[in-house]
Amino acid sequence: MAYSDLMLWLACAAAVLIAVYVTGYLIFLFQKHVLAPDKALMCCLISGFVRKKDIQDIIRRGADPDFDNGLPLLTAVRGTVREQAIRGLIECGADVNIVYPNGSSPLFHAVLSGNTKAVECLAAAGAALDCKIKDGSNLLLCAVGAQAYKTARLLVEKYGFDVNSKNNDGVTVLMAASEFCRWDFSFLKWLQPSLDMNVSDKEGRNHASYGQNNNYLRFWRFLGLLK
């Protein structure tokens, strides 16, 4: 392919990308200014273009930051919304401790999504760090079960979560990690010096029992990377 042809292809690709971006932004502006306030708020959060000022503008138009049982904040912390948009919702009165039907909260969903910035925003705004879901699992246990290791590590290092936390059935962080870890065992290796290795759940199962069907864990141990 000649150099001129290559440059033409690159120019066309750049033009397509610019057109897609401009079209998306025009759709965002339409949603922000034309749709009903609550619907505009949700569409803007989903679009990814939204900023703190956009959130404030839409709420001034009459959007409820907690409509539909806190759906805007839930959407923000679970998605790829910018940190400033989450701050905008919080500053406009979104309830950071709203409880969803399954007993979870916005902070739980931020943790499960691996969204460390959202976790820090919510915690700074007063979100309860000691909350638990119905089975007694705290934020750290849920993070490990979801393989959200960045947020799990943040909870331990910044907020002092106990690495030996357990739920109502006696399942610990180590047991959850042994069962659910796949490729990233650096978190488990990092935890090991502080872990209680001799604890069992209510059925008498220990971390080895939870990890016996985890071929990834067995492979890492075979390589000598984990005890």
Residue ranges and their predicted role:
Residues R51, P65, G79-E83, V96, ...:
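Alpha-solenoid repeat scaffolds
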Residues V34-I46, D66-V77, V99-P106, K132-L139, ...:
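Ankyrin-repeat boundary/"N-cap" motif
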Residues D196-K227:
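Leucine-rich solenoid repeat scaffolds
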Residues A2-G62, G70-L71, R78, G224-K227:
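Intrinsically disordered, low-complexity regulatory segments in ankyrin-centric signaling systems
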Residues D95, Y100-G114, A118, A124, ...:
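A generic tandem-repeat structural signature
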Residues Q56-D64, R87-D95, E120-A128, R153-D162, ...:
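Ankyrin repeat domain, specifically the short helix-to-loop turn at the C-terminus of the second helix
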Residues C43-V50, T75-R82, H109-N115, C142-A148, ...:
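Ankyrin repeat A-helix N-terminal signature
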Residues Y149, L155, Y159-R205:
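Ankyrin-repeat and related helical/solenoid repeat scaffolds used for protein-protein interactions
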